[in-house]
């Protein structure tokens, strides 16, 4: 039995604003079902003696202090913006 339906794949594609064909929807359904099946297999792994970790490697990020620096003058920034108004950069609308 499939763990994900073709309708669910089409719905997620629609939410992501992706146009997919019927053939692609079937292919993605099979691929996602395989991924979900593998993830379910991981639930069967005995991890009783495994210490919980937050990262795969024991590396830590060394961060610098987050200090605000001097920015560019607005006029210089607007020179690089293709469309601007009243000190704001205008971009095309992406939401319906």
UniProtKB/Swiss-Prot annotation:
It catalyses: L-glutamyl-tRNA(Gln) + L-glutamine + ATP + H2O = L-glutaminyl-tRNA(Gln) + L-glutamate + ADP + phosphate + H(+); L-aspartyl-tRNA(Asn) + L-glutamine + ATP + H2O = L-asparaginyl-tRNA(Asn) + L-glutamate + ADP + phosphate + 2 H(+). Transmembrane segments: none annotated. It comes from the Bacteria. GO terms for molecular function: asparaginyl-tRNA synthase (glutamine-hydrolyzing) activity; ATP binding; glutaminyl-tRNA synthase (glutamine-hydrolyzing) activity. Its EC number is 6.3.5.-. InterPro entries: Asp/Glu-ADT_sf_sub_c (IPR036113), GatC (IPR003837). Keywords: ATP-binding, Ligase, Nucleotide-binding, Protein biosynthesis. One of its GO terms (biological process) is regulation of translational fidelity. Heterotrimer of A, B and C subunits. Allows the formation of correctly charged Asn-tRNA(Asn) or Gln-tRNA(Gln) through the transamidation of misacylated Asp-tRNA(Asn) or Glu-tRNA(Gln) in organisms which lack either or both of asparaginyl-tRNA or glutaminyl-tRNA synthetases. The reaction takes place in the presence of glutamine and ATP through an activated phospho-Asp-tRNA(Asn) or phospho-Glu-tRNA(Gln). Belongs to the GatC family. This is Glutamyl-tRNA(Gln) amidotransferase subunit C. The gene is gatC.
């Amino acid at each position: 039995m499939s763990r994900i339906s073709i309708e669910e794949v089409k719905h997620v594609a629609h939410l992501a604003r992706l146009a997919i064909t019927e053939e692609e929807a079937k292919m993605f359904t099979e691929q996602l079902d395989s991924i979900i099946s593998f993830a379910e297999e991981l639930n069967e792994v005995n991890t009783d003696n495994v210490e919980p970790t937050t990262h795969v490697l024991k590396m830590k990020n060394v961060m610098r202090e987050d200090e605000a620096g001097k920015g560019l003058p607005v006029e210089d920034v607007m020179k690089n913006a293709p469309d601007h108004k009243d000190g704001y950069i205008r971009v095309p609308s992406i939401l319906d």
